[in-house]
Amino acid sequence: MDQQALDKAAVLAEALPYIREFSGKTVVIKYGGAAMAAADLKAAVMQDIALMKYVGMHPIVVHGGGPEVSELARRMGIEPQFVDGLRVTDAATMEIAQMVLVGKTNREIVTHLCAQGVKAVGLSGQDAGLIRAARHLHRSRETGEMVDLGFVGDVAAVDTEVLTTLTTAGYVPVIAPIGVGPGGQPYNINADTVAGAIAAAMKAEKLVLLTDVEGVRADKDDPSSLLSRVTAQEVKSWIARGRLQGGMIPKLQCCLTALEGGVNRVHIIDGRVPHSLLLEIFTDEGVGTMVVK
């Protein structure tokens, strides 16, 4: 018997208990970083989500698109600014974010998933009042002073009705991280934050964050210090001590939101690894860092 065929059979056998465990369960996937840019990685993620759907899981996708927003902003003469990993969003930048995230990125993901035979539906947080937003009041971690980030929002509430209706009917929701505030004002919300809030509201079994890092490191400058498992208490301690920087702050804050909302496990995995989503969900070893209560 060909060894390659035997290896494939072993992989399928290893996946069986995970398929059984997660069939019928909701898994929220935050899709961002390099996995959105490279064609081969993008194709792998779409295949992974399709397989999850075909084996009976209920995936919900929340996507980013920051690099594309920055690129269009620069083309329009606006230099992107960030504070503690959050994009400063004036009225012009808000309009650009909507154009890119809702009008372009969301459509592309839906198209790719539909090409895999998945019934995907594109949404933003504005649709059916899915994500109610409140203006984010931010205190700089560097200076301790309040900083006006413009139309940057926090998730005030998630209306799960539309998501439950779609997933029950066999659709895969694909959500752009734009929320709606009082008077219909749109707000730019960090995609990690949205993913954490939706995972909590939907009582998801898992939240998986696809990122451009291997996971969480004990020493951010030492690749060999990757942590396979961390607790919510450790994360809270790191945030309080100012140990975290940049985009890792909202990522780990969203992990806490999800866990406190009833999600069992959160995984931060390297989206630069082809099929990392399948490796995390359907293999014994998994990849990246698992955050638990």
Curated annotation (Swiss-Prot):
Where does this protein act, in terms of pathway? Amino-acid biosynthesis; L-arginine biosynthesis; N(2)-acetyl-L-ornithine from L-glutamate: step 2/4
* Biological process terms in GO annotation: arginine biosynthetic process via ornithine; L-arginine biosynthetic process
Show the InterPro entries listed in the entry: AceGlu_kinase-like_sf, AcgluKinase_fam, ArgB, Asp/Glu/Uridylate_kinase, Glu/AcGlu_kinase, NAGK-C
The chemistry this enzyme catalyses reads: N-acetyl-L-glutamate + ATP = N-acetyl-L-glutamyl 5-phosphate + ADP
A cellular component term from Gene Ontology for this protein is: cytoplasm
- Which residues of this UniProt protein bind substrate? 65-66, 87, 188
Q: Where in the cell is it found?
A: Cytoplasm
Q: What class of enzyme is it?
A: transferase
Which Enzyme Commission number(s) are on file for it?
Answer: 2.7.2.8
Sorted alphabetically, which Gene3D superfamilies does this protein's record hold? Acetylglutamate kinase-like
Q: What is its main location?
A: cytoplasm
Q: Which UniProt keywords apply?
A: Amino-acid biosynthesis, Arginine biosynthesis, ATP-binding, Cytoplasm, Kinase, Nucleotide-binding, Transferase
Q: Which domain of life is it from?
A: Bacteria
Protein family per UniProt: Belongs to the acetylglutamate kinase family. ArgB subfamily.
This chain belongs to the protein called Acetylglutamate kinase
The organism is Symbiobacterium thermophilum (strain DSM 24528 / JCM 14929 / IAM 14863 / T)
Its lineage opens with: Bacteria, Bacillati, Bacillota, Clostridia, Eubacteriales
